[in-house]
């Protein structure tokens, strides 16, 4: 059965789900939700995602929202199909879950307002909060130090294999690397830069970038 993904293919959170599907060889159909027109706030979409965000999915009777929960569900449901994204042991899965939580609570929590201020506000003609950006850059620098230390002794965030721990970071990292002037925060860190170069060369990621037509 083809999974329906409601969202905008260029948006970070839907990309997290789509990348999981591409790694797991899961068939999907993207139902475009135009964020610029605030279609995510309309009653029809609120039935799928009551907080007015994207993505949301429909898979037969199953309806889910929240990208990390969706990715974890499908990585578990199709554990033996495509790339193993969960970790091979109970302890390994706990470490993967830990870094998915780190991505949400520390990485994305800083990266999102950074990107909103340096990318999206200027595009919409709104002023960038320069003071906030400088404050966030200091916070982000400290967050990335933790990643640099982790990746000094591990090929990937979850250990020796590519998992959801790495996948969850990729949409946000793309904005930092490709659409802001902040890429130096990554390229100046040897281990973090090596990690990004490796994971962004994966076929599933390249396919997603083609679908998004960057």
From Swiss-Prot:
Its EC number is 2.5.1.18. SUPFAM superfamilies: GST C-terminal domain-like, Thioredoxin-like. Its main location: cytoplasm. Residues 2-82 form the GST N-terminal domain. It is an enzyme of class 2 (transferase). Residues 89-214 form the GST C-terminal domain. May be involved in the conjugation of reduced glutathione to a wide number of exogenous and endogenous hydrophobic electrophiles and have a detoxification role against certain herbicides. This is Glutathione S-transferase F11. It comes from Arabidopsis thaliana. The lineage of its organism: Eukaryota, Viridiplantae, Streptophyta, Embryophyta, Tracheophyta.
């Amino acid at each position: 059965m083809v999974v329906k993904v409601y969202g905008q293919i260029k948006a970070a959170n839907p990309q997290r789900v789509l990348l999981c599907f591409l790694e797991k060889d899961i068939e999907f159909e993207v139902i475009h939700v135009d964020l610029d027109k605030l279609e995510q706030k309309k009653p029809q979409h609120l039935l799928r995602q009551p907080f007015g965000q994207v993505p949301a999915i429909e898979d037969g009777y199953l309806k889910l929202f929240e990208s990390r929960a969706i990715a974890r569900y499908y990585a578990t449901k199709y554990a033996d199909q495509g790339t193993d994204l969960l970790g091979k042991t109970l302890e390994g899965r706990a470490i993967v879950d830990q870094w998915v939580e780190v991505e949400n609570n520390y990485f994305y929590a800083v990266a999102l307002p950074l990107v909103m201020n340096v990318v999206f506000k200027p595009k919409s003609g709104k002023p960038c909060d320069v003071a906030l950006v400088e404050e966030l850059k200091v916070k982000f620098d400290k967050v990335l130090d933790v990643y640099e230390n982790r990746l000094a002794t591990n090929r990937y965030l979850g250990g020796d294999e590519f998992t959801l721990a790495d996948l969850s970071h990729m949409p946000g990292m793309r904005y930092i690397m490709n659409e802001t002037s902040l890429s130096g925060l990554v390229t100046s860190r040897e281990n973090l830069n090596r990690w990004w170069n490796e994971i962004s060369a994966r076929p599933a990621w390249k396919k997603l970038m083609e679908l998004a037509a960057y």
